Amino acid sequence: MCGITGYIGTDPTGRIVHEGLQNLEYRGYDSAGIALAGGGSLSVHKTGGEVGDLPVPSREDGTRGIGHTRWSTHGEPTRENAHPHTDCTGDVAVVHNGIIENYAALADELRADHVFHSDTDTEVVPHLIETHLADGVSLLTAVQRTTERLTGSYALAITAAGHDGIVVARSDSPLLLGHGDTGTFVASDATAFIEHTNRVTYLRNGDIAHLTETEWTVYNDGARVSRDIEALDWSADAAGKSGYDHYMLKEIHEQPRALRQAISGRISDLGTDVTLDMELSTETLQNVAELQIVACGTSYHAGLYAKELLETHADLPVTVHVASEYELRGGRSPEDTLVVAITQSGETADTLAALRSAAQKGAPTLALTNTLGSTVTREADDALFIRAGPEIGVAATKTFVSQVATAALLTMHIGRARNAISTGDAAALRDAIRDLPGAVQQVLDQAPEIASIGREYADSDAFFYVGRRAGRPVALESALKLKEISYDHAEGFSAGELKHGPLALVTDNTPVVAVLTEYAAPERTANNVKEVQSRGADVIGLASDAGTARHADVTITLPACGPLEPVVANVALQLFAYHIANEKGRPIDKPRNLAKSVTVE
């Protein structure tokens, strides 16, 4: 992994592919490369550094091109290991996302007649294609025969000197086509080409497509198949910085709008009715005995918050699983268990694997995602969209709050279907959902004050975040944000666990961030605050109640927002983390070693 782009058409190919790579930089990478073909020749440009280190190829270098930003999985981040990889003749170029699981056996087979120049799993692909081309077949046929030998996940884009077009292939790794006025694009993410077109085709597992300057054709299992063209509902402007220094800061400030989009048309102004664009029947929801959530990273923390909401307001037992552990745990997912997969991109490999495991065991499945047309929406029985809009920063912000808001809507929907939520609870949750965009805006209006607090703690290198109930997932998520972008150690946990180990690490001036909001057992957490203060810690407290806030050394005052008040605290802590990282001069939008969408297990 991490990003693929390509273009064939009448516009300057090298410039378009280079710009596509720049648009994919947000996904995270450690090396990059471009290959252009045309006029019977192939030119390859690679770097072990940044996309900006690559030259912009001229039109004379080729009329079709592919590019790649690499996030290392096999082999170190060097120029030799950067994509594109070529065959022995230097005529075939391949870029690849995913993992070829049987590459070692294939490489052993090929080494007798082929020379390898990298430590990657990808390099077996151009050598296999070379072998088949030697039989006199077309590039399309050679790729079809090659994919029959591959085990694992892959999104491939291939071009070759002396062969027409670009051939692409997909298996368990995202890949889509873009249809512009001057040619056809291919990418792992529409951000690569959104400035040229919003018309896309999502390739399916097993699809192999042949792109020429005038047409595109898709095959699956050797037969030609039809694939739809869809229009994305966002533009290049939505994916820009809009004058902010970083995408992350822009996306923090977009949260009131994202929340309004998540809520719009789904909740009544007066009653407690919820209308969700999903097809799971009331009967299915009534028969659910347990709900299992599978997710990774920030989405996992949103799942923990959803558990609090569902168990409290829908009287439904919920377990939340780290998706990468779900398959390994054994156990059953019976038909009376609803499995909810939460994934921003809809392409997170571990979450997809967990979803497939649950489906194989007969459980109904629901996807909670931000991405129309993504793999999870096609594989789950139903999908519920969080409507956050494009999120470019590696550190998730607006997608977390949108996931929780959508989970709150789902809680009301399930609670009503099961006759488990009282009129009073439903009204309180409805009011919290409706008030959330305005409450978040009130926090954003305090941005200068929060920035000042963040800068005050920028010299610290270890932070603790504590909370209870819904405050715990917010503590976990806020600690994750800080460690992602500042590179400081940050640990989040239940406030009650302080005395069971973490207290040993608290010394003079240790920053401890305490979520003292409603719906987070603030009085009990305040007792834990006293424990760390007696050991010399500095406590940054987040609360709406002045009486609770007095327990902290530094207070960020929040508006009240009922059961969603901890979400409001999270927004304040996003700003806190951002300004610490900015003061340290960190690359906030592209933190080291991290990728936006993790498409390998």
Swiss-Prot record:
Q: Which Pfam families match?
A: GATase_6 (PF13522), SIS (PF01380)
According to its UniProt record, the EC number is 2.6.1.16
CC annotations in GO: cytoplasm
Q: Which SUPFAM superfamilies match?
A: N-terminal nucleophile aminohydrolases (Ntn hydrolases), SIS domain
Instruction: Using the record's annotation, list all stretches that form the Glutamine amidotransferase type-2 domain.
Output: 2-214
Q: Active-site residues?
A: C2 (nucleophile), K596 (for fru-6p isomerization activity)
* Annotated SIS domain residues: 281-420, 453-591
Report the catalytic activity.
D-fructose 6-phosphate + L-glutamine = D-glucosamine 6-phosphate + L-glutamate
Q: Where does the UniProt annotation locate this protein?
A: Cytoplasm
Q: Could you tell me the keywords of this UniProt record?
A: Aminotransferase, Cytoplasm, Glutamine amidotransferase, Repeat, Transferase
Molecular function as annotated in GO: carbohydrate derivative binding; glutamine-fructose-6-phosphate transaminase (isomerizing) activity
User: What is the recorded function of this protein according to its Swiss-Prot or TrEMBL entry?
Assistant: Catalyzes the first step in hexosamine metabolism, converting fructose-6P into glucosamine-6P using glutamine as a nitrogen source.
Q: Describe the protein's quaternary organization and the partners it interacts with.
A: Homodimer.
Query: What is the name attached to this protein's record?
Result: Glutamine--fructose-6-phosphate aminotransferase [isomerizing]
Query: Which organism does this record belong to?
Result: Halobacterium salinarum (strain ATCC 700922 / JCM 11081 / NRC-1) (Halobacterium halobium)
> Could you tell me the gene encoding this protein?
glmS
